[in-house]
UniProtKB/Swiss-Prot annotation:
Gene from which this protein is expressed: fluC
Provenance organism: Haemophilus influenzae (strain PittEE)
Main location: membrane
Protein name in UniProt: Fluoride-specific ion channel FluC
Keywords: Cell inner membrane, Cell membrane, Ion channel, Ion transport, Membrane, Metal-binding, Sodium, Transmembrane, Transmembrane helix, Transport
Lineage top rank: taxon: Bacteria
Length: 128
């Protein structure tokens, strides 16, 4: 039951941030939901940093992992929103836009995760 509380608290914060990012960035582009891309890229960057942290300090409690990764990042990033946006573009015969959104999410998120790991490694070396 305690694990559910940690996940839920993290999810409240992640979902709230995702909503705020959507409000801020979605009006910038009419062709696709830019907020979802920003949320996914940011979430992947953060998870990269957290992976580096958890790898270096495996003694960090499982509660923090549940709160940050499962709860916060699980609700900040979402594959279902991304999928629906791409499919909607394809169904509206906006093939180029759909393909571009698909590639930006896929490669952008992978790159941000690696960047997050590198950022963590550099920061941990500078601080030690």
């Amino acid at each position: 039951m305690q694990a559910l509380l940690f996940i839920s608290c993290g999810a409240i914060l992640g979902a709230s941030l995702r909503w705020a990012i959507g409000l801020l960035f979605n009006p910038l582009f009419s062709s696709f939901a830019f907020g979802a891309l920003i949320a996914n890229l940011l979430g992947c960057l953060i998870i990269g940093v957290l992976l580096g942290l958890f790898w270096q300090f495996p003694q960090i409690s499982a509660e923090w992992r549940l709160f940050l990764i499962t709860g916060f990042l699980g609700s900040l990033t979402t594959f279902s929103s991304f999928s629906s946006e791409v499919v909607e573009l394809f169904f509206n015969d906006k093939w180029l836009n759909g393909f571009c959104v698909l590639m930006m999410h896929l490669f952008g998120c992978l790159a941000m995760t690696v960047l997050g790991i590198w950022i963590y490694k550099i920061c941990s070396q500078l601080l030690s």
